[in-house]
């Protein structure tokens, strides 16, 4: 290998040095990107964990709102039935 380096021209030596520097910079950049992606992954996992903690609370609120909707529908149904009975009582002959 040393014989090959001695036989290289000045331009080739410069190219090899620059290539080594660029490869080193690329390696450092890739390491930094990997570290930042690991940090992002940890943050996302923590966010998902917090969201899962609220899952039970959201189910309780969902049951509450569904119960309110069904209660409103029952009230409307009872209200319509009561108004029909009142109409029948006021007008028993159906006129």
From Swiss-Prot:
For this protein's source organism, the top of the classification is: Eukaryota, Fungi, Dikarya, Ascomycota, Saccharomycotina
Its Gene Ontology cellular component terms are: cytoplasm; DASH complex; mitotic spindle; mitotic spindle pole body; spindle microtubule
Functional note: Component of the DASH complex that connects microtubules with kinetochores and couples microtubule depolymerisation to chromosome movement; it is involved in retrieving kinetochores to the spindle poles before their re-orientation on the spindle in early mitosis and allows microtubule depolymerization to pull chromosomes apart and resist detachment during anaphase.
Q: Which GO terms describe its biological process?
A: attachment of spindle microtubules to kinetochore; cell division; mitotic sister chromatid biorientation; protein transport along microtubule to mitotic spindle pole body
- The signal peptide stretch is none
Q: Which domain of life is it from?
A: Eukaryota
State the protein's name: DASH complex subunit DAD1
| Keywords, comma-separated and alphabetical | Cell cycle, Cell division, Centromere, Chromosome, Chromosome partition, Cytoplasm, Cytoskeleton, Kinetochore, Microtubule, Mitosis, Nucleus
Source organism (scientific name): Kluyveromyces lactis (strain ATCC 8585 / CBS 2359 / DSM 70799 / NBRC 1267 / NRRL Y-1140 / WM37) (Yeast)
Pfam families xref list: DASH_Dad1
Q: What are the GO MF terms of this UniProt record? A: microtubule plus-end binding
Q: Which residues form a coiled coil?
A: none
- Location of this chain's protein in the cell: Nucleus; Cytoplasm, Cytoskeleton, Spindle; Chromosome, Centromere, Kinetochore
């Amino acid at each position: 290998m040393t014989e090959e380096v001695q036989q290289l021209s000045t331009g080739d030596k410069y190219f090899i040095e620059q290539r080594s520097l660029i490869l080193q910079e690329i390696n450092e950049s890739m390491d930094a990107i990997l570290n930042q992606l690991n940090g992002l992954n940890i943050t996302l996992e923590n966010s998902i964990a917090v969201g899962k903690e609220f899952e039970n609370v959201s189910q309780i609120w969902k049951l509450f709102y569904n119960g309110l909707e069904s209660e409103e529908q029952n009230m409307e149904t009872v209200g319509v039935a009561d108004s029909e009975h009142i109409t029948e009582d006021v007008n028993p002959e159906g006129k």
